[in-house]
Every structure is written in structure tokens, then in C-alpha cells.
């Protein structure tokens, strides 16, 4: 009986390790109101994979464009791998191709035709052994929208702490 519990716990730990977050763009959720998200694959070279698995990716200034019917990721910094020579290492800010179905790209193109919408990378994560990136269609927030969102977030936090205090 105890062995079954150990096996289940080990399987749950393996699933959690197989779906872990590698990089997160927390600033994007502050600067943009995310309307829709999409999980895509990303075309990488070997040293980029090693750097991402070591947690050396920065999504903060990144954005996505649709060019020639392809999704492209721009301005995302993936540090060069520390144990690779300069000859084999990659360019940290190179443009990377995102892998999505044609109908998903067409749907995104239709949404981006609306004024004020942008494609923003939200996070890089593992799904099994594959590296995936979640992108979001976002509408830029004005300063007063950011302040209102911060005020609402603060009030929810205070309510939660008050509820926890009296329970």
C-alpha cells in the first residue's frame, strides 16, 4: 500500500518538473490588458535551449510580429550558453520563429488589425521535453488604468488579509 503512494508522489513530481516555468514577463500584465492567450512552439538552436533551461531568458522588452505569414519573436534576450565557445554560441537578440497553426496565425492577424492591440510574450515554459512560449493579445494600458488596477489589487489584498485574520 505504501509503495503505491510513493509511486503516485513520484509521478506527480515528474509531471510538475515536466511543466515548469522557465521565464515570466510579469511587466506585460502590468502594462497591457491581456485579452487572449495562445501557446506556441519556438524554433531554437541548441545553445538557446541550454540557456533557457538554466533560466537565462528575459522577455521584458519582447514583442511578436506577423511577417510573410509567420509569427516572429523579436527583442527577447536569451543569454549565450556559458560552456559553449563563441563560434557555436547564438546571437542573444536574434529574431526567432514561433510555431503555430495557420488558422491561429490568421485569427491573430485579424485581431491585430484593430488599433491598439499588440502580441506580447508572457512566459516560456516546459511542456514535457518541449519548450513552449505563451503569447498574449494585449491592449496597452494608460497611466490611469494602471493606477486603478493597482488600487483594485491592493484592496483585494487587504480584504484577503482581513479575512485570514478573523478565521
From Swiss-Prot:
One of its GO terms (biological process) is trans-translation. Pfam families: SmpB (PF01668). GO terms for molecular function: RNA binding. InterPro entries: SmpB (IPR023620), SsrA-bd_prot (IPR000037), SsrA-bd_prot_CS (IPR020081). Residues 146-160 have a biased composition (Basic and acidic residues). PROSITE patterns: SSRP. Residues 144-167 are annotated as: Disordered. HAMAP family: SmpB. Required for rescue of stalled ribosomes mediated by trans-translation. Binds to transfer-messenger RNA (tmRNA), required for stable association of tmRNA with ribosomes. tmRNA and SmpB together mimic tRNA shape, replacing the anticodon stem-loop with SmpB. tmRNA is encoded by the ssrA gene; the 2 termini fold to resemble tRNA(Ala) and it encodes a 'tag peptide', a short internal open reading frame. During trans-translation Ala-aminoacylated tmRNA acts like a tRNA, entering the A-site of stalled ribosomes, displacing the stalled mRNA. This is SsrA-binding protein. It comes from Synechococcus sp. (strain CC9902).
